[in-house]
């Protein structure tokens, strides 16, 4: 064969020099040409054809100049001979890697520096000095910018193969890799050492979650305990307390040990990260809280303060989550069985009502004006029936609402339409159920051979929902029927806190489901004369293994709880199609005023108002209920059209009032409303208030009702002079308040006063109340309200449609106060029903209430 063929084949080994056709590298034609041209002085691929022929390659300057190794070292993602992309770890990559094993440049191989080429022989001419090697190392550039490959300059994916190879190669550079380096700015890059990645478990060879936080914390611990000042030239505590959210890690962990101080996710006491944080932050700050966390004990004054107000940390004054780590710690160390809360003690401050509350005694970020917490608490706030720690059973004996009914001046059990008569009935139900023994699985309604099957004479399912069912039951030894609602324990925390109930309505400490607590509060609100438009409950019990009858869902055996309540004749969806306009008007007014009483006392966000969740009782028609709004002195006269409507189902509620102590979200407060006149009616409803918009500097990001982070407040809200005018010149911010975060408002906001500082999220509940009658989209849940009611075009229906068509972004932002009808249920009632300002002639008063 002519030499020119070999030269041509050497220049372009991808084509046959005789035919000009493309040939496959490694194929039969390629191998034949390789053998044919291997006898001459010109070698095609000495490193590929003759393995290890370094001397021959060095002897041929022309071939050495055409070596692919320099280009391969610069860019290992492309074949230096063809220019085509190659897969890292593929056959071509491995062939080039073997061919360039003796190349003196940086190798693209992904191996640890400690194990890279242990038996490699390096030519003396190619040996580098330590200074040259340090200068050629990619580690300094990788430490400065870990998002780029220092050899190619291309962007690399954090955690990808190239990144991990460089991380392994530079493991000893600066003692820490860039992702966990103390000089990396976590706040600017958005990264955190408290991130988890999936790794292979060496023992099981299966994906197992490991916590890089523990490794990084262990490294920081070495620096914290090091005696050498030359090895570490920075303060590692400042690294731990880097600006990730408001405050440092140790400050946030000391303030709330129940949550990860960086991510905000719940943190268990058994979590290894909790142990590491305790070890690192045990000396910072040096406060009684950290002393108690590290096991140095709790003094008597601290226990006394905790027993007086178990909703606040007695050391820091901040809110404590019920059954959280701090709560359990103080409950275990403090015996509160012999300590009773004195009269006039406020739950918000833990001080006596007679002694003024100073600004220094208030917990940080409470946003309350001085003296706001010194007022006497409402009965439902001070009761704490289901939240008093340190006792073996939190509901032993009679609930607090039983003692509340006897204190009312108009307490009359002889009138079947009075709340007192209804309370006496549920009291008898509770007393009877406490004598009934539980079944094998506890107080169950649907388990095999369950409690109801053996004790009840009749059991009829009258309603089904997504998470439970409602039964109308009749017991052998009780004269009347009543309702039992079986609900599934949904939240993980409730399942974790679950403990069986041996006696009806007698719960172990910390095991009461949230809905049971809310129902007890609602019953107490009715018992204290605030509203008759809510259902009354008679206690609850737990079930180990129920088989609930759910709506459109396959039932599984799980843990449940049962609640007993007074019987109703039907839900609103059954009777609404046959209601007259006067009956529907009375029903809507009852629901709105019942909602207002809950907004005032609990700061409730119901989130599930619909016709199916409104219970209706038949009552003899005639008379009226007198309801007084204590905020503006407005008096409503609700005519009795033969139906008593009760707002029920509190399974997904949120209670944003801090004094209640059941939520970390305190709601959106965008203005202060101060009444300057008695409440007005019709189109003038709400204009009796002086409106002062609120601005804040910090925005708390809440998605899905959960805290995400904080950022500068840039959420703009435009205010109008009236509800029908155009947008004015007043521009403010959207102000979301969250427990423990100071959003820096421009005025003192009393979060417990939901009348002066209404919760903007209440617009959804008001809209759902009205849309239940006039139709429309559900505000708090997916779907639409089915139009059961047959509209007639009456005046109140047109006013209700105005409220129902509110804009969720702009409605309510009016300087004259007319937009309050979208937020406050009582103002909406005054706008829709101006005729209820006076009673009907000749009608008698059934009962009076003040909300």
UniProtKB/Swiss-Prot annotation:
Keyword annotations: ATP-binding, Kinase, Nucleotide-binding, Serine/threonine-protein kinase, Transferase
InterPro entries attached to this UniProt entry: 2-cysteine_adaptor, Kinase-like_dom_sf, Prot_kinase_dom, Protein_kinase_ATP_BS, Ser/Thr_kinase_AS
Annotated Pfam families: 2C_adapt (PF08793)
Region (Disordered): 1-24, 61-91, 104-160, 190-216, 340-400
Segments passing through the bilayer: none
Active-site residues per Swiss-Prot or TrEMBL entry: 608 (proton acceptor)
Domain Protein kinase: 456-851
Highest rank taxon of the organism: Viruses
EC number, as in UniProt: 2.7.11.1
SMART domains: S_TKc
Compositional bias segments (type: Basic residues): 196-216
Reaction(s) catalysed by this chain's protein: L-seryl-[protein] + ATP = O-phospho-L-seryl-[protein] + ADP + H(+); L-threonyl-[protein] + ATP = O-phospho-L-threonyl-[protein] + ADP + H(+)
Chain coiled-coil ranges: none
MF GO annotations: ATP binding; protein serine kinase activity; protein serine/threonine kinase activity
Residues the entry annotates as binding ATP: 462-470, 485
Stated family: Belongs to the protein kinase superfamily. Ser/Thr protein kinase family.
Name of the protein this chain belongs to: Putative serine/threonine-protein kinase 019R
Species whose genome carries this gene: Frog virus 3 (isolate Goorha)
